[in-house]
Amino acid sequence: SAASDVYKRQLLKLINDILELSRIESGNMTFSYSTCNLNNWVDSMYLTHSLLIPKEIEFIKEVPDAAFFINTDVNRLSQIMTNFLNNATKFTKSGYIKLGYEIDFSTYEVSIYVEDTGKGIPKEEQPTILERFYKQDEFVQGTGLGLSISKTIVNKLEGQIGADSVEGKGSTFWFTIPYRTCGRPE
């Protein structure tokens, strides 16, 4: 039946997420570093996800005029961003979803973010949103592990992850990673 197919997919996703988390934490997750043009990467994420975001939601990308290059694991960045964008899409019914990045030349960090005008997160729940099995809404699909996996990946990339949210107004999920290994463009 269709219901059992949905259940099977959710169970498989949960198992895969748990396996992914244990791989990361045991040190068995591999990271593959390469030079990444962040503008091209944001363009790619934008094109991929623009097909999944409902037409009534404005989808915006915000990048600096000049391309910026960092040495990182592009697949892991995409994994985090996909999680952020999927969550924004689940909880935003009108307004916009914005993805982009900013460079902080004083700290040698890149901050990558997704901002939305979704329902926001209640203040009392905000300290626990990056923990395992956190789900804002038990009726919305998902395992509650995506943000925990994202947090673990960001930690392995020597960065920080967080969220700023106002209930009823929206959220901004962000992570920062150092770019010192790639240097600044001339």
Question: Model-predicted segments: where are they?
Answer:
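Coiled-coil phosphoacceptor/dimerization helix of two-component systems
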Residues: 10-21, 41, 84
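Short, small-residue-biased leader/transition segments that mark boundaries at the very start
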Residues: 1-7, 145
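Glycine-rich ATP-binding loops of the HATPase_c
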Residues: 158-164
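Short conserved segment of the HATPase_c
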Residues: 121-133
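Conserved catalytic submotifs in the C-terminal HATPase_c
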Residues: 32-36, 54, 58-68
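Short alpha-helical Gxxx[C/S/T] motif in the catalytic ATP-binding
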Residues: 146, 150
